[in-house]
């Protein structure tokens, strides 16, 4: 136990579990008592009664669990959380537990044990050592948990509690005073760099470069506005041999022209009359109405009148 680092004046909680030899447990407790001296204290607690004992929070410098070679224990998440609660800030937890090399529901791997220790609020979790279980411990473990694998070993883990209490808070100091910003010294502007950005094509003194004047690329005809007829393709809307038809993506105006002609062709001249009620029937027609005797018709319907009906007597 000398390699644990327990020193005089420390308060140690020794957690044991079944099966444990009373002689071995007493010997370990006496050895720890000699290390802590009269100023320290060594308390013994059975793991099954650890939570029910309600130890004071942050009251132990050390929690040593299942370190007896003739016993074993699987630490639950509740047990680990209780151990973390009773440890002082910066206190240590050292435990031993059987682990397996493959994932199993009854015995966890060393990686999952490390994860469980971290989830309980402990930090600096390290694997100190790993050794095979004794045949007696393997038999007892299989009887206790029902585990039937053969990849069992005993691992010792060390962890620490952070140097603050779980759930503790501290006030953050903020300065809300108006801060005067110091003037930032801008780098000096390099005249040559500025000149490089202001160069134009005319400033380049290079006889090997033949520059083209963009204004000389256009002549007077290029500035004339074209008429609609010149924009049409040679065969666009040629009605001499076939019906006029605009291109799919017509942009010369023929499509709009044909659309207007189509609308005009569909317009049907309405029957003209003085009263405007001739289409309703004889009950609404005048005595001299040319539609007398004809059935009612729809507005806009083309009606052909007999020549006799238009003769005046």
UniProtKB/Swiss-Prot annotation:
Spell out the PANTHER family in the cross-references. ANAMORSIN
Task: Quote the record's binding site residues for [4Fe-4S] cluster.
Answer: 275, 278, 286, 289
The ranges of region (Fe-S binding site B) come to 275-289
Motif stretch (Cx2C motif 1): 275-278
Molecular function GO terms recorded: 2 iron, 2 sulfur cluster binding; 4 iron, 4 sulfur cluster binding; electron transfer activity; metal ion binding
Q: Mainly localized where?
A: cytoplasm
Choose any GO biological process term that the UniProt entry carries and state it: iron-sulfur cluster assembly
Ranges for region Linker: 171-223
Q: What does this protein do?
A: Component of the cytosolic iron-sulfur (Fe-S) protein assembly (CIA) machinery required for the maturation of extramitochondrial Fe-S proteins. Part of an electron transfer chain functioning in an early step of cytosolic Fe-S biogenesis, facilitating the de novo assembly of a [4Fe-4S] cluster on the scaffold complex NUBP1-NUBP2. Electrons are transferred to CIAPIN1 from NADPH via the FAD- and FMN-containing protein NDOR1.
Q: Is Iron one of the keywords UniProt gives this record?
A: yes
Q: What is this protein called?
A: Anamorsin-A
Q: Sorted alphabetically, which SUPFAM superfamilies does this protein's record hold?
A: S-adenosyl-L-methionine-dependent methyltransferases
Q: Cross-referenced InterPro entries, in alphabetical order?
A: Anamorsin, Anamorsin_N_metazoan, CIAPIN1, SAM-dependent_MTases_sf
């Amino acid at each position: 136990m000398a390699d644990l680092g327990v020193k005089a004046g420390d308060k140690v909680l020794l957690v044991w579990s079944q099966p444990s030899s009373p002689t071995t447990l007493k010997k370990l407790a006496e050895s720890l008592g000699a290390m802590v001296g009269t100023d320290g204290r060594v308390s013994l607690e059975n793991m099954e009664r650890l939570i029910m004992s309600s130890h004071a929070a942050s009251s132990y410098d050390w929690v040593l669990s299942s370190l007896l070679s003739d016993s074993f224990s699987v630490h639950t998440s509740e047990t680990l959380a209780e151990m973390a609660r009773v440890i002082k800030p910066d206190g240590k937890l050292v435990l031993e537990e059987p682990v397996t090399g493959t994932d199993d529901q009854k015995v966890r791997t060393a990686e999952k044990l490390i994860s469980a220790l971290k989830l309980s609020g402990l930090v600096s979790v390290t694997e100190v050592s790993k050794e095979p279980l004794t045949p007696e411990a393997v038999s007892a473990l299989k009887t206790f948990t029902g585990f039937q694998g053969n990849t069992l070993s005993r691992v010792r883990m060390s962890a620490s509690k952070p140097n603050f209490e779980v759930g503790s808070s501290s006030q953050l100091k903020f300065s809300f005073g108006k801060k005067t910003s110091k003037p930032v010294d801008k780098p000096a502007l390099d005249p040559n760099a500025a000149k490089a950005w202001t160069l134009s094509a005319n400033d380049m003194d290079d006889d090997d470069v033949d520059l083209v004047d963009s204004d000389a690329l256009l002549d007077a005809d290029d500035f004339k506005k074209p008429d609609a007829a010149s924009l049409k393709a040679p065969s666009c809307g040629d009605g001499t041999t076939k019906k006029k038809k605009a291109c799919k993506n017509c942009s010369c105006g023929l499509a709009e022209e044909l659309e207007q002609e189509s609308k005009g062709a569909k317009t049907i001249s309405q029957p003209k009359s003085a009263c405007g009620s001739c289409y309703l029937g004889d009950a609404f027609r005048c005595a001299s109405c040319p539609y007398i005797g004809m059935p009612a018709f729809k507005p806009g319907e083309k009606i052909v009148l007999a020549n006799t009906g238009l003769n005046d007597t």
